């Protein structure tokens, strides 16, 4: 059986660029068919009203909508459209989504909230395309090496397994905090685990500082160094995440969870071992 998955990307968070790739890392998984529709960097209601209906015209077993701030007007419109549609759907968002998770549940939708997927320092004086790309590369490193992406992978794989079993997919209600992320990372060395925990906690705080610099402070002489400091924090978090993985590599205990020939999730730690 081939499970048909729809992914709608509107705006961008650090999970967005790799979401579909987490499900098919070698592009050879036989049991899923993934279609992605998006609206680029923008997520206003107008973009949403084009992107979501486009996806709903397709035959999908379930749909995932990913964006920053699920409570913002555009994502709120997406939730409204998906709630009214005859297809199981879930929302993936960043920490502001915590404020509307009860509302998401009431709409009959699932959710994954990634607390350490932080808002970027979107001030024109500071953020250019190079800085934007650097920020997102740091987010990806943090979320990959702290285990957050594995939580996303496992959660969606469970939905795929439900569909394969002939059941409606169980819609998740997952908040990825430090403990949940690092548990999924499977660190063996306690120092590696501590570094990963520190990385996730720092990344979680980055959003608070960027919100202050982007919305609460109006003097450029103040908000420019504020958002710059948030990006420096994230860079430090990425370095800690890399250090955590390097410790595990030195001990040959890196947990890897590839998808097998039939699409099932396998596991291994020894580098030269076959995944089982």
UniProtKB/Swiss-Prot annotation:
This is F420-dependent methylenetetrahydromethanopterin dehydrogenase. GO terms for biological process: methanogenesis, from carbon dioxide; one-carbon metabolic process. It comes from Methanothermobacter marburgensis (strain ATCC BAA-927 / DSM 2133 / JCM 14651 / NBRC 100331 / OCM 82 / Marburg). Activity requires salt; 100 mM sodium or potassium salts of chloride, phosphate or sulfate are equally effective. Not inactivated by O(2). Inhibited by hydrogen-producing 5,10-methenyltetrahydromethanopterin hydrogenase which has a higher affinity for their shared substrate. Enzyme is O(2)-stable and strictly dependent on coenzyme F420. Residues 253-276 are annotated as: Disordered. Belongs to the MTD family. Optimum pH is 6.0. Optimum pH is 4.0. Its EC number is 1.5.98.1. Pathway: One-carbon metabolism; methanogenesis from CO(2); 5,10-methylene-5,6,7,8-tetrahydromethanopterin from 5,10-methenyl-5,6,7,8-tetrahydromethanopterin (coenzyme F420 route): step 1/1. Residues 259-276 have a biased composition (Basic and acidic residues). Induction: Enzyme activity is not detectable when grown anaerobically. GO terms for molecular function: ferredoxin hydrogenase activity; methylenetetrahydromethanopterin dehydrogenase activity. Optimum temperature is 55-65 degrees Celsius. Thermostable up to 40 degrees Celsius. Catalyzes the reversible reduction of methenyl-H(4)MPT(+) to methylene-H(4)MPT. It catalyses: 5,10-methylenetetrahydromethanopterin + oxidized coenzyme F420-(gamma-L-Glu)(n) + 2 H(+) = 5,10-methenyl-5,6,7,8-tetrahydromethanopterin + reduced coenzyme F420-(gamma-L-Glu)(n). Disulfide bonds: none annotated. Found to be tightly associated with methyl-coenzyme M methylreductase.
């Amino acid at each position: 059986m081939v499970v048909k998955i729809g992914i709608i990307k509107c705006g961008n968070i650090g999970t967005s660029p790799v979401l579909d790739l987490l499900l098919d890392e070698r592009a050879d998984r036989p049991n899923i068919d993934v279609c992605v529709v998006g609206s680029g960097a923008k997520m206003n209601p107008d973009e949403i009203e084009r992107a979501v209906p486009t996806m709903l015209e397709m035959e999908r077993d379930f749909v995932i909508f990913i964006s920053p701030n699920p409570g913002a007007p555009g994502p709120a419109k997406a939730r409204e459209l998906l709630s009214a549609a005859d297809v199981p759907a879930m929302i993936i968002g960043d920490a502001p989504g915590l404020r509307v998770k009860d509302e998401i549940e009431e709409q009959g939708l699932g959710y994954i909230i990634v607390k350490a997927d932080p808002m970027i320092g979107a001030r024109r004086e500071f953020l250019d395309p190079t800085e934007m790309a650097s920020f997102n590369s740091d987010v990806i490193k943090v979320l990959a090496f702290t285990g957050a992406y594995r939580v996303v992978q496992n959660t969606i794989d469970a939905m795929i397994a439900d569909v394969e079993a002939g059941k409606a997919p169980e819609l998740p209600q997952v908040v990825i905090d430090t403990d949940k992320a690092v548990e999924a990372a499977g660190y063996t060395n306690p120092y590696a685990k501590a570094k990963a925990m520190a990385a996730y906690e720092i990344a979680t705080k980055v959003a608070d500082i960027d919100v202050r610099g982007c919305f609460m402070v109006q003097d450029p002489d103040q908000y420019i160094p504020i958002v710059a400091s948030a990006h420096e924090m994230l860079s430090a978090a990425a370095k800690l995440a890399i250090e955590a993985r390097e410790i595990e590599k030195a001990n040959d205990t890196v947990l890897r969870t590839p998808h097998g020939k039939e699409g099932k999730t396998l596991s291994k730690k020894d580098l030269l071992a076959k995944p089982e």
